[in-house]
Amino acid sequence: MNSNKKKGLTAASLIVLLLIIDQAIKLAVKLNMTLGESIHIFDWFQIEFVENNGMAWGMELGSKLFLSFFRIFAVVGLIWYVRGRIKKGARMAYIVVLSMICAGAAGNIFDSLIYGQIFPASTPYYIEGAVPSTLTTWGEGYAPMLMG
């Protein structure tokens, strides 16, 4: 196997692996934690259940549908860019970093595509004794496709 094919296979495998890990963690949090709850892992690391309506830090630029289409465009562009960098012989470390960014962006597309369809809306208020979210019948969640 030549070097470019090896890099391409590594990039694709890393993206798929990170997407699986990302979704497994998000589903575990959504199904086992209440909004605002946190789990202490180390002094410097905790998992906290927060929900974000927009982009990073809750920024909102236009509608959720616009954001979803922007994400799709960005992931397609990033995959095209990674492919081009592989063909030009970029270092593996650079390909790995780009693949990680691509996996994160693709995970956000999956979230907006699916989560609004399968989960009820989370309450922003702490309710004593609240139970974690449950799955709903497909299409009966809190938002239409690409707007979750």
Predicted regions and their residues:
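Alpha-helical transmembrane bundles and membrane-interface segments of multipass inner-membrane proteins
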Residues: 1-148
